[in-house]
Amino acid sequence: MKHILVVDDDSSVLKFLAHALGDYRVSVARDPDEALNVARSISSLDLIVTDYLMPSMTGDELIARLREQRPSLKVLILTGHSVILDVENPPWWVTEAHLAKPMEIEALRGAVAQLIGLP
């Protein structure tokens, strides 16, 4: 079963994401530091789904740190803020995909399926 790490500092969003991705094995983290610790404990991690704006570091900073250990880690980044999603410039170049929050469950599941395949 594919393993996904979901990172978001909003507990209601974290719960929504974990539920929506229930067909996969899901680990959750409430902040980037917890995500780094959780990722170290997972031997086979297929995807990270992470918020972009979080208190201790941004999503692209988290991704850079995770990719130091897992260079081929696939990423789906989420943002709930009024950010223009410019795929030509950072931070979006560090990810394989991005979605704006709020998103439909089908959009989330579709993006995940494209990145890592069906469970």
Predicted regions and their residues:
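Two-component/phosphorelay signaling modules centered on CheY-like receiver
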Residues: 11-28
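Acidic, metal-coordinating helix/loop segments flanking the phosphotransfer/catalytic sites
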Residues: 28-47, 68
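C-terminal output helix
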Residues: 103-114
